[in-house]
């Protein structure tokens, strides 16, 4: 099954996540089909907290990809900010 989920990056104590489209059997930070955005939970100042390619996210959801719980919240937040 294809899922849209977060892949952790960054360094120790400074998380950074990529929104990735991947097979659910792949490792969290492993192989992916496409990166469709990023999420920086500790963004400060002028840094961008969330960036999502809405067109690609809509495409993958239309193809049957299942978002994780957190990604579903982030997609909703991004859609609200874009409107």
Swiss-Prot record:
GO terms for biological process: translation. GO terms for cellular component: cytoplasm; small ribosomal subunit. One of its GO terms (molecular function) is structural constituent of ribosome. It comes from Ectopseudomonas mendocina (strain ymp) (Pseudomonas mendocina). Keywords: Ribonucleoprotein, Ribosomal protein. Pfam families: Ribosomal_S16. SUPFAM superfamilies: Ribosomal protein S16. The keyword Ribosomal protein applies. This is Small ribosomal subunit protein bS16. PANTHER family: 30S RIBOSOMAL PROTEIN S16, SMALL RIBOSOMAL SUBUNIT PROTEIN BS16M.
């Amino acid at each position: 099954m294809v899922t849209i989920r977060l892949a952790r990056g960054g360094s120790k104590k400074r998380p950074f996540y990529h929104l990735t489209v991947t097979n659910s059997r792949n490792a969290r930070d492993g192989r992916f089909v496409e990166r469709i955005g990023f999420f920086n939970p500790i963004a400060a100042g002028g840094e961008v907290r969330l960036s999502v390619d809405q067109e690609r996210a809509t495409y993958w959801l239309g193809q049957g990809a299942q978002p994780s719980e957190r990604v579903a919240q982030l997609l909703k937040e991004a859609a609200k900010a874009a409107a």
